[in-house]
């Protein structure tokens, strides 16, 4: 494990916090290293077996949860409400697909976000941009926006509580599809949080102890970067977001790094193309990966490629664009011989107005906007998105 740590630390790492107090970082990392792993290696093996079934076309996947988690929402009530939405979406997806559904929450660690800019201007003041509760505060005050390493410990504590509320106290003894509890995943972004949580089992296998199923995003998928280097060597199943600008050669090289042994279900690719690009850009990528021998799970992230700005100035997403991308994604993957296995959604149990169900909704986006970062689907909109799986690419949605 020490060799892996050295390799990762020798690589360039993008989107990392600039901590204000190095001594606090040292203390936080020591705490994380000495803390109990949030997951067990036995659970990882169960999940990998389950995802092998998904890669074979025998089951589907629903991933849903906050864009950026609120660390204060680690109470039993908050967790139960989020899990309930995931259960509803999984049940709906099972009705639509007539297949078992693996439930996965964007939860218990989705506390950090990559950002396009390091700073933002609020009024006459330029401040560090908010990067998630694990890094800095949301309040538009300089002191709150400093990168605070003590938040790493708070993040671990919140994640631990959430895992317990989800039901991860008992051991996993069989493949879990629609059973409880839900699996957890988050973007593996802040290496000062992730690296101290590397663990090694009795057989010498290294696994990430912070989540069951880590993913990396468009901004951290550099082939020789620290994030890819780390994910390439952990026992966990791994995932990577794939946008419209990736080339076939880049994707094949990425798959070779993350799935060198070509193990079914080891690697999931989450397509975030945008409704206007998915039909053109995705099929050649799916075909290239299939011909290279990778048994990939393909998921659709229909959110990030369809972000626009509402008249009020808030970021939003049109539900119609989301449903159109879902239908086009399914057709694109299946027509190219891949396994279109499910959805990766940003959702909330709250009745928010962050995404617009129709043109009139664009003018109401700000009325109930609670997201810490990007716009999420409310429960009714999320059900609409799941139902779009049965649509043909040209279908239109029913408005809520």
Swiss-Prot record:
Keywords: Antibiotic biosynthesis, Transferase, Virulence. It holds the Pfam family DAHP_synth_2. Its EC number is 2.5.1.54. The keyword Membrane does not apply. It is an enzyme of class 2 (transferase). It catalyses: D-erythrose 4-phosphate + phosphoenolpyruvate + H2O = 7-phospho-2-dehydro-3-deoxy-D-arabino-heptonate + phosphate. GO terms for biological process: aromatic amino acid family biosynthetic process; phenazine biosynthetic process. The keyword DNA damage does not apply. Transmembrane segments: none annotated. GO terms for molecular function: 3-deoxy-7-phosphoheptulonate synthase activity. SUPFAM superfamilies: Aldolase (SSF51569). Pathway: Antibiotic biosynthesis; phenazine biosynthesis. PANTHER family: PHOSPHO-2-DEHYDRO-3-DEOXYHEPTONATE ALDOLASE, PHOSPHO-2-DEHYDRO-3-DEOXYHEPTONATE ALDOLASE 1, 2. Belongs to the class-II DAHP synthase family. This is Probable phospho-2-dehydro-3-deoxyheptonate aldolase. The lineage of its organism: Bacteria, Pseudomonadati, Pseudomonadota, Gammaproteobacteria, Pseudomonadales.
């Amino acid at each position: 494990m020490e060799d892996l740590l050295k390799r990762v630390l020798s690589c360039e790492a993008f989107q990392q916090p600039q901590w204000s107090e190095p001594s606090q970082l040292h203390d936080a990392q020591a705490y994380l290293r000495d803390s109990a792993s949030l997951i067990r290696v036995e659970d990882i093996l169960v999940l990998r077996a389950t995802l092998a079934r998904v890669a074979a076309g025998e089951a589907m996947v629903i991933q849903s949860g906050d864009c950026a988690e609120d660390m204060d929402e680690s109470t039993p009530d908050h967790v139960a409400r989020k899990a309930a939405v995931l259960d509803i979406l999984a049940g709906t997806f099972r009705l639509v697909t007539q297949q078992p559904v693996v439930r996965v929450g964007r939860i218990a660690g989705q506390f950090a976000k990559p950002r396009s800019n390091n700073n933002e201007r609020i009024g006459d003041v330029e401040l560090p941009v908010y990067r998630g509760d694990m890094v800095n505060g949301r309040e538009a005050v300089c002191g709150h926006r400093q990168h605070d390493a003590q938040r790493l410990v708070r993040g671990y504590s919140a994640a631990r509580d959430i895992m317990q509320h989800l039901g991860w106290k008992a051991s996993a003894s069989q493949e879990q599809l629609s059973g409880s509890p839900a699996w957890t995943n988050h973007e593996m972004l802040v290496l000062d949080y992730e690296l101290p949580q590397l663990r090694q089992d009795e057989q010498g296998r290294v696994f990430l102890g912070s989540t069951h199923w880590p993913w990396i995003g468009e901004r951290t998928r550099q082939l020789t970067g620290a994030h890819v280097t780390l994910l390439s060597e952990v026992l966990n199943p791994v995932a990577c977001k794939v946008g419209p600008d990736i080339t076939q050669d880049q994707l094949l090289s990425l798959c070779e790094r993350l799935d060198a042994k070509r193990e079914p279900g080891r690697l999931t690719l989450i397509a975030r193309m945008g409704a206007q690009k998915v039909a053109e850009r995705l099929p050649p990528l799916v075909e290239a990966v299939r011909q290279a021998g990778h048994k990939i799970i393909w998921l659709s992230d229909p959110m990030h490629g369809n972000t626009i700005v509402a008249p009020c100035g808030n970021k939003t997403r049109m539900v119609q664009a989301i449903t159109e991308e879902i239908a086009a994604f399914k057709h694109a993957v299946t027509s190219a011989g891949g396994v279109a296995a499910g959805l990766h959604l940003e959702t909330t149990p709250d009745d928010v107005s962050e995404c617009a169900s129709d043109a009139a909704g664009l003018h109401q986006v700000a009325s109930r906007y609670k997201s810490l970062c990007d716009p999420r689907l409310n429960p009714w909109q999320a059900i609409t998105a799941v139902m779009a799986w049965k649509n043909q690419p040209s279908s239109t949605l029913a408005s809520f």
